[in-house]
Amino acid sequence: GGESSNEAKGMWFGPRL
């Protein structure tokens, strides 16, 4: 969840906000 972060495979925020 955030920048350069894959949270739940892009379900919440994604690889980039």
Swiss-Prot record:
The modification Leucine amide is found at residue 17. InterPro entries: Pyrokinin_CS. It is found in: Secreted. Its main location: secreted. GO terms for molecular function: neuropeptide hormone activity. One of its GO terms (biological process) is neuropeptide signaling pathway. GO terms for cellular component: extracellular region. Keywords: Amidation, Neuropeptide, Secreted. Myoactive. Belongs to the pyrokinin family. This is Pyrokinin-5b. It comes from Blaptica dubia.
